[in-house]
C-alpha cells in the first residue's frame, strides 16, 4: 500500500510539473532525443507542441484587476493617465 501511495504521489507531482511548465518536459525529451531527434519538429523552438510561452512571466496579469479600487478611484486614474 505504501508503494502504491508513493507511486501515485510521484506521478501526481510529475503531472503537475508537466502541466505548469512546457520547458521541463520539452528540455528533457530534447536532451534525450538529441538535436535532430524523432520529435525535433514538435519540441524545437518553432515546435507545435512545446514552446517558450510558459517561460514568460505571466504574474503581471494579477495586478490588472484590483477589486479594492472604487469607481471614483478608476475615474481619477483614467483622468490622470489620459495624457500620459
UniProtKB/Swiss-Prot annotation:
The lineage of its organism: Eukaryota, Metazoa, Ecdysozoa, Arthropoda, Chelicerata. It comes from the Eukaryota. The modification Leucine amide is found at residue 33. Antimicrobial peptide. This is Peptide Ctry2346. One of its GO terms (cellular component) is membrane. It is found in: Secreted; Target cell membrane. The keyword Signal applies. One of its GO terms (biological process) is regulation of defense response to virus.
Amino acid at each position: 500500500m505504501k508503494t502504491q501511495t508513493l507511486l501515485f504521489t510521484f506521478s501526481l507531482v510529475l503531472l503537475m510539473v508537466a502541466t505548469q511548465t512546457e520547458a521541463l518536459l520539452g528540455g528533457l525529451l530534447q536532451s534525450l532525443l538529441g538535436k535532430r531527434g524523432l520529435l525535433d519538429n514538435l519540441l524545437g523552438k518553432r515546435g507545435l507542441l512545446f514552446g517558450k510561452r510558459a517561460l514568460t512571466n505571466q504574474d503581471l496579469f494579477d495586478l490588472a484587476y484590483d477589486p479594492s479600487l472604487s469607481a471614483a478611484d478608476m475615474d481619477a486614474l483614467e483622468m490622470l493617465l489620459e495624457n500620459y
